[in-house]
A protein has these predicted regions:
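Tandem CBS (Cystathionine beta-synthase) repeat/Bateman regulatory domains
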Residues: 1-147
Length: 147
């Protein structure tokens, strides 16, 4: 069985140069933990995850202690940092060395890559073009419906 047999086509994606605000909006409405990132020629360049976005907005320990050191201070600092960063571009947050598979790869190979590397959703890229994603849920669906 091939990756193309079970992958999700038309994955949630965003372009380089988009804002952190736009990425956060897309993550929240698409209900996926990561967005595939494309350049202006629609070539796959990497991904940005909800963890990357939250981590960028987390206050530094020094900022929390300077604000008073309480949990409420930390959350207020988190929100302020989020507002400050919202209009910045996602480009520095993009993971550019992401593992990928091709649509013509054997599904078993992709499953091994995902499990060995702890990957929940794997970009499917053919000749530099994003053609889909393969998730652990897609793997489970393959087992259920194709066995």
């Amino acid at each position: 069985m091939l990756v193309s047999d079970v992958m999700t086509a038309f994955p949630a994606h965003i372009r380089l140069g988009a804002t952190i605000r736009r990425a956060a909006e897309l993550v929240s409405v698409s209900e996926v933990g990561q967005l595939m990132v494309l350049d202006h020629d629609s070539r796959f360049v990497g991904l940005v995850s909800e963890e990357d976005l939250v981590r960028a907005m987390l206050p530094r320990f020094e900022d929390v202690t300077a604000a008073g050191g309480t949990l409420a201070d930390a959350f207020r600092t988190f929100l302020e940092r989020g507002r400050t960063l919202a209009d910045r571009v996602i480009d520095p947050l993009v993971v550019r060395d992401a593992a990928t598979v091709r649509s013509t790869d054997e599904l078993a190979r992709a499953a091994v890559v995902m499990i060995d590397r702890g990957i929940r959703r794997l970009p499917v890229v053919d000749n530099g073009v994003l053609v889909g994603t393969l998730s652990r849920a897609d793997l489970c669906r393959a087992v259920i419906y194709h066995s």
